[in-house]
Amino acid sequence: LSNALKKFIKPGDEIIVTNQDHEANISPWRRLEDIGAKIIEWKFNLDSHELQIADLENILSSKTKILAVTHCSNIVGSVNNLKKISDLAHKQNIIVIGDGVSYAPHGFPNVKELGVDFYTFSLYKTYGPHLGLMYGKEEILKTLPNQNHEYLKGKYPYTINPGGPNHEELVSLI
């Protein structure tokens, strides 16, 4: 996802990650420092172990383009209010990615209600196959550069799946 979204990043643009997240939702965004992105860390409150909206308001800027945040922290166990976070970020046209890998085993995420632009988690965390699942708003997905074979260029939705589908694992979901 970070590779596809880098088209929205110019040198000096900011990406916010949190210190509540799993490394899998931090490293891909940090790699965009190679193209000039500035990574800002939204730190949780040491007393409450929660991300504070007021702290987010203080670090958002006109240069912020992406906010990657966990729905439920595997580090401190708090559940973040993605609806409030998304509403605040969207006021500044910031793309919001919710990492649901630690939330999905405990509840069904309603991505429409959460207001996120993308939501990801690993199906094996919900006793499924070792596959990743990603929800994305179609109006953004359709604008992403091809992540698949070059001959599929421009043929959405095939352009957003790097490689082919894993049929044997997909059938296990039925």
Regions found by a protein language model. Name each.
Residues 1-174:
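Pyridoxal 5′-phosphate
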